[in-house]
C-alpha cells in the first residue's frame, strides 16, 4: 500500500507558477514551471523511477515482511515487540518532525538537490542491507542496533522524499507536472507490488505448495529454517534502492550551481516563511481547523499502515508466506481506493468524502481488533480447532478470512482519504496563497509523525495487549473526524 506523496511548497507552488511561463523557450525546448529548460524524456522518466527504487522499502521493511519478523521472532514476544516497534517509529517520527522544516527550507532555496539525494541513498542502502544480520539470539545484531538502523533508514527515507519532491517543478514541462507526479506514484506502487510477488515466488512458496511453476526450494540457497526468507528483505531493499536510484543520478538534470542563499541563510529564510504563515493562520480559522484535523487522522492512518502487519502476525501467528500474500492483496485493493476516493470527491464533495473515508477506516479498525482466532466481533466464540476452509497454507480459517476482508476495506478507505485530503485543501485555501498553505499541509503531515507510534507503543505496554495497542489508533481517528465536522467547505479570502 502506497502512502500518497505530501508535496512541499516547491512542488505545489509549481502549480501556480506553471501559468507564468510559456510552454517552450526560444529554442523550442519545453520550459519547466520554474522557467528553466525542462529535463528531456529520459531525465523525466528517471525522476519517476526513483519512486520505483524507494517504495519496496516501505512494503518489505516497514509493513509486511521485516517488521513482523522483528517483533515476533527477533524480540520473541509479540506484545513487547509491538511496543518496541512503536517506540522505534516514534523516535524516527520525532527526528523527522524536528528536521523536516529545515530540510524543506534547504530544498526550497533552489540549490542542487542530487548531492543530498545521493547522501540519503548512500545512508539508506547499506543500513537496510545490514538488516540481513538481524537474527534471533546472541549471534545476530542486538535489538538496540536494529532499532538504530531502522531509525536511520526511516529518517533518510523521509528526507529523500523532501528533495525528490522539490526537483519536480524544474524537471517536468510546466504542462506535464501532474502527469509526471502520477507516473512516479504509479511506478512506486508497481515496484512494491512486483517485489512482493518476487518474494512470494522466490522465497515464500517454494517447499510449501506443489504447483508446477514454483521452485522446489527457495532460490539462491536461502535457508527458510534460519528465517533467511524474511531477513533477505533487507539486502533486497538496499540493493534495489541503490541500483534504481542510479538513473536519477545519471540522467535527471539538477539545478546548476548558483549564488543562491547559503545553507544557514536558507534555513533562516525557510523558518521565517513557516513562522509567518503560521501567524497568518489566525486569519484563516477554517483552514487551520482542517490542517489540525488532518494532522490527527493522518497520524492514525499512518499508524495503521505501520502496525497492520505486526498486529496480524502476532494475533494470528502468520508466517512470512502469509504476510507476503497479505501485502499483495492489500496493495491491489489500495489501488481501487484511489478511484473510490475520486468518485466520492466528485459526487459528494471533499468534506463528505473525507468523513466517509475516516469513518470507514475507524469502523474497519474496530472490526479488525474484534476478530481473533478464538473470537469473532468481540462476542461470538470460535473454536480454533474447527475445520479449515481450504488446504492452502494461508488464510485457512474463518477468522483469518474475515480479518483480511475487513482490512481490505481499511486499505481502500485509507487510500481514498489520502487522495481526498489534498483536494480538500485545494478547495479551502486562498487561491493566491496556495503554495504557502500546501507548505503547511506538508508540515502537518510530519509535525506529529511520532504521535501514532508513541500511542500504540505506550498502550501496548500499559495493557500488555496487542489488541488494546492497535485499537488506541481509534483515538486519533476520532479526534480528526470530530474536527473535520467543524470545517466548512468554502474557499477562504486572502488577507494581505
Which positions does each model-derived feature cover?
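Juxtamembrane intracellular "pre-TM" segments in multi-pass secondary transporters
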Residues: 28-45, 253-291, 388-394
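Helix-to-loop junctions at the C-terminal end of transmembrane segments
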Residues: 98-112, 337-350, 371, 376, ...
Amino acid at each position: 500500500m502506497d502512502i500518497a506523496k505530501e508535496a512541499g511548497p516547491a512542488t505545489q507552488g509549481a502549480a501556480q507558477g506553471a501559468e507564468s511561463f510559456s510552454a517552450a523557450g526560444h529554442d523550442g525546448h519545453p520550459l519547466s514551471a520554474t522557467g528553466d529548460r525542462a529535463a528531456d524524456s529520459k531525465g523525466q522518466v528517471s525522476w519517476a523511477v526513483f519512486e520505483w527504487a524507494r517504495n519496496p522499502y516501505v512494503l518489505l521493511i516497514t509493513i509486511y515482511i521485516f517488521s513482523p519478523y522483528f517483533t515476533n521472532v527477533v524480540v520473541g514476544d509479540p506484545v513487547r515487540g509491538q511496543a518496541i516497534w512503536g517506540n522505534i517509529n516514534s523516535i524516527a517520527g520525532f527526528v523527522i518532525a524536528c528536521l523536516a522544516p529545515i530540510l524543506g527550507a534547504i530544498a526550497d532555496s533552489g540549490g542542487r538537490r542530487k548531492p543530498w539525494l545521493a547522501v540519503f541513498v548512500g545512508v539508506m542502502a547499506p543500513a537496510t542491507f545490514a538488516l540481513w544480520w538481524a537474527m534471533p539470539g546472541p549471534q545476530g545484531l542486538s535489538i538496540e542496533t536494529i532499532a538504530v538502523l531502522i531509525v536511520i533508514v526511516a529518517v533518510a527515507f523521509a528526507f529523500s522524499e523532501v528533495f525528490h519532491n522539490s526537483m519536480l517543478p524544474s524537471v517536468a514541462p510546466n504542462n506535464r507536472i501532474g502527469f509526471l507526479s502520477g507516473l512516479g506514484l504509479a511506478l512506486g506502487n508497481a515496484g512494491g507490488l512486483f517485489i512482493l510477488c518476487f518474494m512470494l515466488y522466490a522465497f515464500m512458496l517454494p517447499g510449501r505448495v506443489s504447483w508446477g511453476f514454483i521452485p522446489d526450494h527457495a532460490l539462491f540457497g536461502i535457508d527458510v529454517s534460519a528465517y533467511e526468507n524474511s531477513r533477505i528483505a533487507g539486502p533486497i531493499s538496499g540493493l534495489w534502492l541503490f541500483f534504481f536510484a542510479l538513473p536519477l543520478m545519471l540522467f535527471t538534470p539538477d539545478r546548476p550551481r548558483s549564488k543562491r542563499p547559503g545553507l544557514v541563510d536558507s534555513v533562516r529564510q525557510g523558518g521565517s516563511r513557516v513562522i509567518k504563515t503560521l501567524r497568518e493562520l489566525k486569519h484563516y480559522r477554517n483552514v487551520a481547523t482542517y490542517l489540525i484535523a488532518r494532522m490527527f487522522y493522518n497520524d492514525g492512518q499512518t499508524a495503521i499502515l505501520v502496525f497492520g502487519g505486526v498486529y496480524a502476525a502476532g494475533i494470528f501467528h502468520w508466517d512470512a508466506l502469509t504476510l507476503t500474500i497479505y501485502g499483495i492483496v492489500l496493495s491491489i485493493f489500495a489501488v481501487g481506493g484511489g478511484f473510490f476516493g475520486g468518485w466520492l470527491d466528485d459526487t459528494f464533495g471533499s468534506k463528505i468524502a473525507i468523513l466517509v473515508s475516516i469513518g470507514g477506516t475507524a469502523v474497519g479498525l474496530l472490526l479488525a481488533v474484534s476478530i481473533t482466532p478464538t473470537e469473532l466481533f468481540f462476542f461470538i466464540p470460535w473454536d480454533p480447532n474447527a475445520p479449515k476452509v481450504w488446504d492452502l497454507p494461508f488464510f485457512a480459517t474463518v477468522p483469518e478470512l474475515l480479518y483480511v476482508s475487513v482490512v481490505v476495506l481499511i486499505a481502500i478507505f485509507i487510500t481514498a482519504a489520502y487522495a481526498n485530503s489534498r483536494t480538500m485543501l485545494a478547495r479551502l485555501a486562498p487561491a493566491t496563497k496556495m503554495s504557502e498553505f500546501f507548505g503547511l499541509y506538508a508540515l502537518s503531515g510530519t509535525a506529529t509523525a511520532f504521535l501514532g507510534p508513541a500511542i500504540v507503543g505506550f498502550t501496548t505496554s500499559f495493557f500488555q495487549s496487542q489488541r488494546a495497542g492497535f485499537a488506541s489508533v481509534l483515538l486519533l481517528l476520532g479526534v480528526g473526524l470530530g474536527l473535520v465536522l467543524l470545517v466548512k467547505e468554502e474557499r477562504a479570502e486572502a488577507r494581505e
